[in-house]
Amino acid sequence: MHQSYKAFMIILVVCSSLTMYFTQTDNTKTYAFSDQVIQQGAVGEDVIELQARLQYLGFYNGKIDGVFGWGTYWALRNFQYEFGMEIDGLAGQTTKDKLVQASNYDKEYVTEQINKGNQFTHYGGGDRNTDGQSNSGGGSGNSGEDTGGTPSVNVPQGYSQNDIQLMANAVYGEARGEPYEGQVAVAAVILNRLNSALFPDTVSGVIFEPRAFTAVADGQIWLEPNDKAREAVLDAINGWDPSGNALYYFNPDTATSGWIWTRPQIKQIGKHIFCK
């Protein structure tokens, strides 16, 4: 009788311990997204978590405010690219799962800072920046979202609608039929030249520099670009550079310049070889 009672108590203790373990595990489970697909224009807690996790990983540099604007959209696309996912700018279940796996989210801290109106960051691997001051008094800091005015066309800061159109023309003329990544890479080369002292400092100057682009020489620059070409330009402007910081590219099947073969090669995407 005594032995039976003792065995019963041991089993009871073990079961109680397991129950407490799983209860605690469930209670301390990392907060994660709801089931909705989060997309541009969305607002609320899911967007706050999305922005915080993207910022934790270094993809989002804007204000964590729960508003899914352009800054959040492009940060999400860059995350999807870097993690080898479908690049659609939508936070579906696969993307959310990968974000949860790759980042941490301190919901209590973020919620507290937002409720207090503080300026703060949520970057991983470093001290958080909280100045304790409200954002309600204005300020000149760039939030990473389109907060100023209401432009008729969404154009990234620093570029005119004409710049976007001209670059889309160049990408379409130079790289239509190439993989999307290759089209973004061509747009990135234009931007890399724009930021190099070796080339003109305007989009039109780079594109129309003599003998710079085949599409200008053969007139294909004036073909009407499709939406994919424009999207490739916007992806490049917002930080995606599949070219590896290339300044040149060429098609080895059609290149007639011996000089281009002397350039250090970075990679090949589709039919184009990208070079330093």
Curated annotation (Swiss-Prot):
Fetch the Pfam families from UniProt.
Hydrolase_2, PG_binding_1
GO annotation, biological process: cell wall organization; spore germination; sporulation resulting in formation of a cellular spore
Keyword tags: Cell wall biogenesis/degradation, Germination, Hydrolase, Signal, Sporulation
Q: Which residues does the annotated region (Disordered) include?
A: 118-158
InterPro entries, sorted: Cell_wall_hydrolase_SleB, Peptidoglycan-bd-like, PGBD-like_sf, PGBDSf, SleB_dom1, Spore_cortex_SleB
Secretion signal, residue range per the UniProt entry: 1-25
GO molecular function of the protein, one example? hydrolase activity
Q: Which family does it belong to?
A: Belongs to the SleB family.
Q: What does this protein do?
A: Required for spore cortex hydrolysis during germination.
Q: Name the NCBIfam families for this protein.
A: spore_SleB (TIGR02869)
Identification of the protein by name: Spore cortex-lytic enzyme
Species: Oceanobacillus iheyensis (strain DSM 14371 / CIP 107618 / JCM 11309 / KCTC 3954 / HTE831)
Gene behind the chain: sleB
